[in-house]
Amino acid sequence: MDHSVWRFSAREPAAIAHGGDLGSLRRAFPDAPNPWLDLSTGINPIPYPVPPVEASAWTRLPEAAEVQALRVAAASAYGAPSGAHIVPAPGTQILIETLPRLLAPTRVAVLGPTYAEHAAAWTRAGHAVAEVPSLDAIGDAGVVVIVDPNNPDGRTFSRAERRGLAATLETRGGLLVADEAFADLEPVESLCPHVGPGLVVLRSFGKTYGLAGLRLGFAVAEPGIAARMAEALGPWAVSGPALAIGTAALSDSAWRAETARARAADAARLDRMIARAGGRVVGGTCLFRTADFSDGPGLYRLLAAAGIAVRRFTERPDRLRFGLPPDRTGWCRLSRVLT
């Protein structure tokens, strides 16, 4: 078969490890008890109570008014200037993939270590990508990517630092991409109210609302950039059920405030449990905690043998990331291994 029309190479793409891969763990630890307790992601274990969805949402194409309602709800929840600044998408990951393809090839600095899909997406789109350890190391990059709060260590930058960086990049025709996937429940100041030609913000829905399978995420950008991104995604990018559920959830500020309080208490409880096990918490958010252990690989295997999945890091074998258990049974299972 002649593959000359294809732009991709024949080599297999390199796989990026993610949390939530229970299939691989079941194969590696076939004697582990079921059901597995999945603490390998940073997804809220107590999901938003899904409201009833009209049957027609499953059977007809989404309407423009429904998309606009979601945009307005998202703008209010995130503090964006208007619904015209909001780009709904079937998950933030597709936005991470789409944005690099809209820009001419340039130098990209990714503040790392962080979520690996950012560097991978910019590289696939033909940009020259470097992972840098600090804002001082970005040099003359045309695009800078920061995850704030960062995954996996929870690192944050002040709003002044982030706004200053966006302004600097804008003056030279560049762009700051601020991934605020874990910002909803944290006491951080979002950049969403300040988007302009040099700033695009990404927001995740599934992590905060515990509905990752719904596939919903947002870009917040000035209206011209937002329109280009929406055009790149194509029509009906978000399903009817996701539009309905997302609009209801984003409009529920009381649930969001109570969830922030409850998950912060859970994170503090997890920190105490990790400390009793000899771990040193190095950071995180209220949806996950990252810690170093004297024998990280050994603890990882011990947890897996007990049917508990946590996130490990090839480059830092002493480091593990823990999500939050969903209920009393989950907390007890984790406690038995860590004590």
List each language-model region with its residue ranges:
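N-terminal "arm"/small-domain region of PLP-dependent enzymes with the aminotransferase-like
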Residues: D2-E66, A73
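Short, conserved charged micro-motifs
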Residues: V50, A137, D295-L302, R328-R333
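Conserved beta-loop-alpha segment that forms the PLP phosphate-binding cup at the N-terminus of a helix
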Residues: Q68, G83-V108, G217
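Conserved PLP-anchoring active-site segment centered on the Schiff-base-forming lysine
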Residues: P100-T123, A128-A130, S134-L135
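Active-site phosphate-binding strand-loop segment of PLP-dependent enzymes
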Residues: T123, A130-L185
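PLP-dependent enzyme catalytic core of the Aspartate aminotransferase-like
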Residues: S158-A160, A305, E315-T339
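PLP-dependent aminotransferase class I/II
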Residues: G198-V281
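Conserved PLP-binding catalytic core of the aspartate aminotransferase-like
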Residues: A264, I274-A306, L324
